[in-house]
């Protein structure tokens, strides 16, 4: 399992997984897998991480590095 800070960042912004999916264009299943640790967000495609960072109004570094 891979630890990601994506869930805490999403919750800080007050977004559900579904809302983040719609806002970022990243499939809901991918977001769930990153948050649950089934997929390593550090191995995600660059465009995916960029979309998530833009949707969360944060730096890419904030997403790929655990807190």
Question: Where are these predicted regions, by residue range?
Answer:
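Conserved hydrophobic/aromatic packing and binding residues within compact polymer-binding modules
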Residues: 6, 20, 31-34, 63
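Short C-terminal boundary/hinge segments that cap the last helix of small helical domains
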Residues: 56-67
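Recognition helix of helix-turn-helix/homeodomain-like DNA-binding domains
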Residues: 26-41
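The alpha-helix within a helix-turn-helix
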Residues: 10, 21, 53
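Short, basic-rich loop-to-helix N-cap that marks the start of a DNA-contacting helix
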Residues: 38-51
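A short, Lys/Arg-rich alpha-helix, primarily the initiator
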Residues: 1-14
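Short coil turns linking two alpha-helices in DNA-binding domains
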Residues: 16, 27-30, 45, 59
């Amino acid at each position: 399992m891979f630890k990601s800070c994506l869930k805490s960042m999403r919750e800080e912004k007050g977004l559900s997984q579904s809302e983040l999916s719609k806002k970022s264009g990243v499939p809901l299943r991918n977001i769930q897998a990153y948050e649950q640790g089934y997929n390593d967000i550090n191995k995600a495609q660059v465009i995916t991480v960029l979309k998530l960072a833009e949707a969360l109004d944060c730096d890419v570094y904030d997403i790929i590095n655990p807190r």
